[in-house]
């Protein structure tokens, strides 16, 4: 796999100021599609919205962004209906019609993630199970639920096997969920989705997006055991920078290529039917802190 990537990030500076959430609007159709992703978004705190950075990250999302992927923990602290109404809706809710969500552990702090499923409705997938797939721009997208069993023999694992088999002719595949299999953040590596990661690797998937650790990190293409695989490996991104309080990085994990933890932002992916480009866009208005490109697996 060819790639053009930035070097290891230095210290990021958090800019002051804010941005208003954009108006909802129709996405612009083009030969490629632009997809924005982040998790760990709207923190209501105990006295209303304490962390206005969800407004600032919402301000990065443009009418030309076809899809918006949430990587779990859509609201804090407990994923309650009032949090979706008071904190998510005024920020990222401005483009709700373009959101394809995934749930996080804080969404499940309200029984069965009920408020999450009520808020997103059909966009959250069928039967309130929290996993589903769809196609856009020549890509196959898979939203998974890392709060539910995804090991070998589970219903989610069997569903993913069938979904990948049914879409084996699709050249480019992207999957996303909440808990990272690999992370240099304080939560560290979480093996609950390792079987899923291996399934995706075997099927030739290109990208995995996750949140949970409130940092930005990009890993080299690898398999579920952490072995580098430049030709067929899955490139994973942690984008837990959607608005909640940022964490500190820990010792870098093997194959971590870029990481930073001092600014909120979103990952913007430009996807064509044969390749992809990525850029981490910070809220301070500076140039992307990480950007690159690669072809889909042949």
PLM feature segments, named:
Residues 16-20:
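N-terminal Sec signal peptide cleavage junction
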Residues 279-289:
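Short, solvent-exposed aromatic-acidic interface loops
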């Amino acid at each position: 796999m060819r790639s053009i990537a930035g070097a290891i990030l230095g210290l990021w500076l958090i800019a002051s100021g804010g941005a208003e959430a954009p108006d909802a609007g129709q996405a612009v159709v083009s030969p490629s599609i632009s997809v924005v992703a982040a998790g760990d978004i709207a923190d209501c705190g105990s006295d209303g919205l304490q962390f206005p950075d969800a407004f600032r990250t919402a301000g990065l999302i443009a009418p030309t962004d076809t899809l918006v992927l949430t990587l779990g923990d859509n609201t804090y602290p407990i994923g309650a209906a009032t949090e979706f109404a008071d904190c998510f809706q005024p920020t990222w809710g401005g483009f709700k019609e373009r959101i394809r969500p995934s749930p996080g552990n804080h969404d499940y702090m309200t029984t069965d993630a009920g408020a999450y499923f009520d808020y997103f409705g059909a966009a959250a997938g069928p039967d309130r199970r929290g996993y589903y797939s769809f196609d856009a721009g020549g890509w196959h997208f898979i939203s998974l639920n890392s709060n539910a069993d995804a090991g070998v023999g589970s219903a989610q694992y069997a569903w993913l096997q069938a979904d990948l088999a049914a879409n084996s002719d699709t050249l480019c595949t992207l999957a996303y969920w909440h808990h990272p299999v690999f992370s240099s953040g304080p939560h560290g590596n979480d093996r609950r989705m390792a079987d899923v990661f291996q399934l995706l690797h075997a099927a030739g998937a290109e990208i995995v997006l996750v949140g949970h650790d409130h940092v930005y990190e990009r890993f080299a293409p690898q398999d579920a055991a952490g072995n580098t695989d430049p030709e067929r490996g899955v490139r994973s991104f942690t984008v837990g920078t959607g608005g909640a309080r940022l964490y500190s990085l820990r010792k870098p994990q093997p194959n971590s290529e870029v990481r930073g933890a001092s600014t909120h932002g979103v990952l913007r992916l430009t996807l064509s039917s044969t390749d992809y480009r990525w850029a981490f866009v910070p809220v301070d208005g500076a140039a992307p802190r990480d950007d690159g490109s690669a072809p889909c697996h042949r």
